[in-house]
């Protein structure tokens, strides 16, 4: 289990994200799409179109991490873009 700092803000990128993007591509999405600093200690969550893959981008003050979760059954429930 990865322990994130208490009180860390979590941002969900609405809609589907191109899951071919890696750390740098997602960091660019955070800057351009969400208007946030990807190095600010917040968690940024992205979901692929089929809904079975989720990526979390996080900078812990030392370096950037990219966590990936793929589920075998069902889908991640995700908000639609406003």
Label every PLM stretch briefly.
Residues 1-82:
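Polybasic/polar functional segments that serve as interface/processing modules
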């Amino acid at each position: 289990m990865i322990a994130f700092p208490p009180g860390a803000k979590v941002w969900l990128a609405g809609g589907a994200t191109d899951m071919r993007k890696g750390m740098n591509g997602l960091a660019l999405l955070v800057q351009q799409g969400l208007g946030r600093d990807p190095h600010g200690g917040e968690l940024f969550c992205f979901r692929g179109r089929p809904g079975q893959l989720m990526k979390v981008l996080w900078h812990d003050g030392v370096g950037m991490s990219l966590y990936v979760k793929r589920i075998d059954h069902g889908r991640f429930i995700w908000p639609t873009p406003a």
